[in-house]
Amino acid sequence: MTGLSREMIIHPGETLKEVLENKNMTQKELVLKTGVSTKYINSVLRGEKNMSASFAKKLEYALNIEAEFWVNLQNAYDKEILEYQK
């Protein structure tokens, strides 16, 4: 185990939540810009669903943040969870 507690492992949805706050963008606006359902976005924001590559690409368009950033966040999260579970 890496010494990380579960609470220290940050899901990409937390970062997305912060980005939305910083851009003063509502979830409803994100739904309109991405064409993704409110249910899916809420699930990502709550850390219940992982961020898919296709959603990352839609975020790139909607937020002007490269899809690679979101994919890398998800990959890092997945790796940390695996390490935590060892």
Describe the predicted segments one by one.
Residues 1-26:
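A short, Lys/Arg-rich alpha-helix, primarily the initiator
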Residues 21, 32, 43, 57, ...:
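Alpha-helical residues within the helix-turn-helix
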Residues 25-43:
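Short alpha-helical DNA-recognition segment
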Residues 35, 46, 75:
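Residue-level detection of the helix-turn-helix DNA-binding "recognition helix"
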Residues 48-62, 78:
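Short, basic-rich loop-to-helix N-cap that marks the start of a DNA-contacting helix
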Residues 69-86:
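Short amphipathic recognition helices of helix-turn-helix/homeodomain-type DNA-binding modules
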